[in-house]
Regions:
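The feature marks the mature, well-folded catalytic cores of soluble enzymes
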Residues: 1-335
Length: 335
């Protein structure tokens, strides 16, 4: 295991997130085949109003900021067009030991989302320290992919990475991630109601400090399902077991954050409205629910609120450095 920058336990929840404000959001034909949550092509996609998407984006950023979350907003570049740039958690993750991890993406038109200037902006504006780059993007040459915290649901506090194999989540790359960042793996097959592989683990489940949301019905192997539930209980998580319908409404695509004002769970209005009163009460016993309506992003992009947020766990520096000095440990962080 590579040496870490700190031996302190990693907190589960971040107080800071990266969001990327899109310039060319839209239905992406290169991702549609592997994402059953992504809907609408043709005329309906062509009539999508960018202003509606930007309003949804701004509403989420504003709601999080009002709740005390530090939101670092990067601007998507107009060229080349990047229809999924609003989902930065698929290409980058930031860790408490100073590690920045970059990930291989299935769709060729998503790979230009990995932009060094975004990482530099995060480090500069947040006054963060970066000590190591783990760049897995070279695995794209082998047609092997691992799409960040879309493919991975991380129990950071207990060093367990949950993942369901799919065209976007390769077991070999998963093993490399686990070795580089010192995670135990819990893998399982997950299918939607039409018996298709679920594209990303983070629509199947979410993990907070003391709870986990899981679609048990999607984990088709009974032994795998029992193992996942047993591991979650052993690590102190109260389980909210959602249905396949609720999974389709992004009820598993939620994220707990920990600003100074108190913990919150970010989710979409669609997800919130799908919860039963009992499920909602259980979640509210752990954190406040912050729900925002993002119907266009969910419908055309096939991702929910959690997909729009890349948590920032990087350690702070004593002073604000220049971008290049702060990123001195990074070697060619984009492909």
């Amino acid at each position: 295991m590579p040496a870490a920058d700190t031996n302190d336990p990693e907190p589960q929840n971040a107080a800071r997130v990266l969001m990327v404000r899109p310039a060319s959001f839209g239905w992406n034909p290169q991702t549609a085949a592997s994402n059953a949550f992504q809907s609408a092509s043709g005329e309906s996609a062509r009539t999508l109003q960018q202003s509606a998407v930007l309003s949804e984006f701004d509403a989420l950023a504003d709601a999080l900021q009002r709740a005390g979350v530090e939101v670092l907003i990067a601007a998507d570049s107009p060229e080349p067009p990047k229809p999924d740039a609003i989902f930065p958690n698929n290409w980058v993750s930031f860790h408490h030991d100073g590690t920045v991890a970059l990930y291989p993406l299935l769709a060729p038109n998503r790979r230009c989302e990995r932009r060094e200037e975004i990482i530099e902006q995060v480090v500069r504006e947040g006054s963060f320290r970066v000590s190591r780059l783990v760049d897995l993007s070279h695995r794209e040459a082998e047609q092997k992919y691992l799409e960040g915290t879309g493919s991975l649901v991380l129990d950071r506090a207990h060093r367990v990475a949950y993942a369901c194999p799919s065209p976007r989540t390769d077991l070999d790359v998963l093993g490399e991630f686990a070795q580089q960042l010192d995670y135990e793996l819990m893998t399982f097959e997950a299918l939607d109601g039409a018996q298709r592989a679920v594209y990303h683990t983070n629509v199947v489940m979410a993990i907070g400090a003391g709870f986990a949301v899981v679609c048990g019905d999607s984990i088709v192997n009974a032994e795998h399902r029992a193992a996942v539930f047993a591991k979650l209980r052993a690590t102190g998580h109260n389980i909210v077991d959602i249905s396949l319908r609720q999974m389709g409404d992004f009820a598993g695509n939620v994220l707990e954050l920990a600003p100074e004002k108190g913990n919150l769970i970010a989710l979409s209005t669609t997800a919130l409205q799908s919860l039963t009163p009992t499920q909602r009460r259980l979640l509210e016993s752990h954190a406040d629910l912050v729900a925002v309506s993002i119907p266009n992003i969910e419908h055309f992009g096939g991702g929910g609120v959690r997909c729009m947020l890349a948590e920032i766990h990087l350690p702070k520096r004593a002073r604000v450095p220049g971008s290049r000095a702060a990123l001195g440990a990074l070697k060619s962080p984009v492909s």
